[in-house]
Amino acid sequence: MTKKQRALLAVEALKKEYPEAICSLVADDPFQLLVATRLSAQCTDARVNLVTPALFAKYPTIAAFAEADVKDVEELVHSCGFYHAKARDIVGMANEVLTRFGGVVPDNIEDLTSLPGVGRKTANLICGDVYGKPAVVADTHLIRISNRLGLVKTKDPYKVEIQLKKLLPPEESNDFCHRCV
């Protein structure tokens, strides 16, 4: 059996077992999902979902985040860990989205990864969940499961992303990643 055949079997098995493939982060708009995803680094989605209601209530728009005092954001996101960097990045992201992208969260990897604190994992999540583009969100869970299934033989997130893009049907790639988590 080829890796591509194995990947298709995995897609079908996971689809049958987990028909609802959704992101566990709670967000009402693309920028909120971008913020929640940044907070999720080295933190559980459950913890992020406890923090974001107060954060989004205090800063309901991208402009509000852009004008926020980083120290105030730090206080709200403290329990997510790495709060100095995360707060700085969130305020920086808001400023960049406003000034460079006219208040619209970018829809491509290159522009997304140019934002403070946004790597390929976050960029792929936004491209897939917000814009419906084929995306592989190579987090630790997907990397571990893909290795166990024999789809990849690497722990490098970028290599996993590229290899899985070749194996997974584009229309299934984003959901496959959610189902693995």
How should these model regions be labeled?
Residues 2-181:
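Catalytic cores of DNA base-excision repair glycosylases
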